[in-house]
Amino acid sequence: MRMNFSTVLLGSSVALAAVSGAQAADAIVAAEPEPMDYVRVCDAFGIGYFYIPGTETCLKINGYARFQVSFGPDEVNKRQGWGAQGTSDWDAFSRAYIAFSAKSDTELGTLTGFFASEFNADNDSDVGDSLINLDEAYIQLGGFKAGFFYSWWDKGLNGETDSLANITEFNSIAYLYEGGAFQAGVAINELEGATTKANGIGVQGIVSATVGGVSIDLLGGYDTEVEEGAIRALVSAELGPGVFQIAGVWASDPNVYFAASEWTVATSYRYNATEKLAITPGLHYWGDYGFVSDADQWRGGLAVDYKITSGLASRVSVQYTSRDIGADTEDFVSGFVRLQRDF
């Protein structure tokens, strides 16, 4: 009996060991973690781009947060379009701006997709804090560009004194040839809503050249809805510790590109006092203002920029304007104080 019991015990132990071994063979083993595809810096298109994981597309996200207090006659009306509802001569508002730029190399050149939007708040009301604006949205391949974007008329002088254009943003198709120091381009703009007429387009053309520290832009635009046009020249030159600029515009009659006067000339000088401080005085004169003979307007002012710290800057603008349209004369001071955090 003792012999049989030992035999049974030994057999049971062998069986248990076999079952245990079989269970161990069938056990689930955790897989080794796959290496993470960390975000990589993309330096092919400038600072701030990174590769979208798993692609060869580079993405940049940037923007700013701004607080500004503006002052001038009926400033609230001008900014918000409230008409008789508001008569304050000062206005505080805040803005958030964010932009996304996606770029990749192709056999046809650099492919870009760009989107930017503004979120504005003038006060705590359903009207004032819901001012969302699509700033730009376009596709660009090499020199070809299509979408909603700022035209070449949007370029102005340094400072805050000049006003050298009328409407500057359109749904457009444009092509810009860039040959080093020389550029030439043409654009077709949709004008729907710009006038009371229909089915018209705007055509722009630009030629630019840079020689040393001097650059020259020659720009023209023709509005087919009103059959009028405008031409503009703008010169920038590095001069001493700053940049001198001068520009002139002539228009055949009011049109989508320029509608303030028959002719105008403006100038400014940005003086870089230190690495943080820049001072920009400016002058602007409009002849035949409002396309009325012998009517004129002039403006003189100063803009001061100060870099408080990395990513945080301020700007103060003070402008004096004098307008003379026959018996209608007006003199006023306007400007703003701005604080902006860029990222």
Swiss-Prot record:
Asked if Membrane is a keyword of the record, the answer is yes
Matching entries from InterPro entries are given as: Porin_alphabac
Name where it mostly resides.
membrane
Q: Keyword Membrane on this protein?
A: yes
Q: Which UniProt keywords apply?
A: Cell outer membrane, Ion transport, Membrane, Plasmid, Porin, Signal, Transmembrane, Transmembrane beta strand, Transport
Q: Which domain of life is it from?
A: Bacteria
Q: Where is the signal peptide?
A: 1-17
Gene Ontology molecular functions: porin activity
Topology of the protein relative to the lipid bilayer = Peripheral membrane protein
Q: Which GO terms describe its cellular component?
A: cell outer membrane; pore complex
Question: Which GO biological-process labels does this protein carry?
Answer: monoatomic ion transport
Q: Spell out the subcellular localization from the entry.
A: Cell outer membrane
Q: Which family does it belong to?
A: Belongs to the alphaproteobacteria porin family.
The job of this chain, per UniProt, is described as:
May act as an outer membrane pore.
Q: What is this protein called?
A: Putative outer membrane protein y4fJ
